[in-house]
A protein has these predicted regions:
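Hydrophobic transmembrane helical bundles of multi-pass organellar membrane proteins
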Residues: 1-142
Length: 142
């Protein structure tokens, strides 16, 4: 394999890996998350509960309000990973993609017109999660 093909392969693994890990975390929040948990309760679990009651509410949120907890967690993880293992671009790429999971989630609740052609194309081709695929998640019990 050439260096470029190795990088492309790593990027694909990073995207699928980060997508899987954020999905596992979201599943964990739905099943085990409690509003009285330290930090996560107020800033993650409560927000998730509100989202399940009114899924479109998140579409009016700014990028920062959607992703700040993910970016704060990613920054902490980056500092720790650099401290213990040194700098690796793969870790940075994973944290960047993972930190934007809520933006991709927001797109599943928007119309094609709100998303624009590029995002709608990515959803239609399965490159990112489609509205239909995400819809089952909002059926009880969640």
């Amino acid at each position: 394999m050439t260096a470029l093909s190795i990088i492309i392969f790593k990027i694909l693994l990073i995207i699928f890996g980060a997508d899987f890990l954020t999905g596992v975390f979201h599943f964990w929040m739905d099943v085990y998350g409690r509003a009285d948990m330290p930090f996560l309760g107020k800033h993650v679990v409560e927000v998730n509960m509100i989202h399940h009651k009114n899924p479109r509410k998140m579409t009016s949120n700014s990028y920062f309000s959607l992703t700040w907890t993910s970016w704060a967690t990613a920054l902490l993880m980056l500092v720790l990973s650099v401290w213990f293992w040194g700098f690796h671009w793969e870790i940075v790429a994973t944290l960047i993609y993972g930190s934007n999971a809520n933006l991709i989630h927001k797109w599943t609740h928007q119309t094609d017109k709100e998303n624009g052609r590029l995002v709608s194309f990515f959803q239609a081709t399965g490159i990112i999660q489609s509205k239909r695929h995400h819809g089952w998640h909002h059926k009880a019990p969640f």
